[in-house]
Amino acid sequence: MPASEPATLPVLAAQAAVLARRLPEVAEVWGRGRLDPKLREQVMLAVAHANACRWCTYAHRQWALAEGVTDAELAALEDERSEAFDRRTWAAIAWAQARAHADLGPAPDELERELARHFDASERADLDLVTRAMTAANVSANTFDALLSRLRGRPVAHSRLVDEVAIGAGVALAIPPVAAYLMLWRRRPPRLLARELRTLHAAR
């Protein structure tokens, strides 16, 4: 997994403002399933891995499995390999990964053209929304990780304490309900979930 990048308050605020203006689309994509849920989770997991977010990668592995993503597809997503996917699915994954690697800048022209071959303008807008939302969550969780690193005496280069405290506090509040949801929805016993999270923490 590549190195994770923390967020700054101004950058995250700008991302949040874009998402706030698109709340009706959020309701359609997540609430009403306008974008195929399996494809949505494949894209979100690919973006989480591109952004090196261990927390989001862990959580979205569980959601992806629930939506029918196979273990082989999970492995291919994390290795950025195309052979496990049809051309349409891979066009979305590769495009989203490129956007994540470019800090939400444009993807290379060939990826933009390939995406347009398989998705209409409305679908491309939905994929953009998913990529933006996942990136905002990823960099927030990475900033929480930067705070944990600072507390262990290993501050992350170019990461500011004020960003870590403000953003990390929000992430810390979100972790317990997400963990509870995973325990109930995925029927993961608390002891197993705690062991997996400890392993995740030790990997940092």
What are these regions (language model features)?
Residues 1-204:
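Hydrophobic alpha-helical segments
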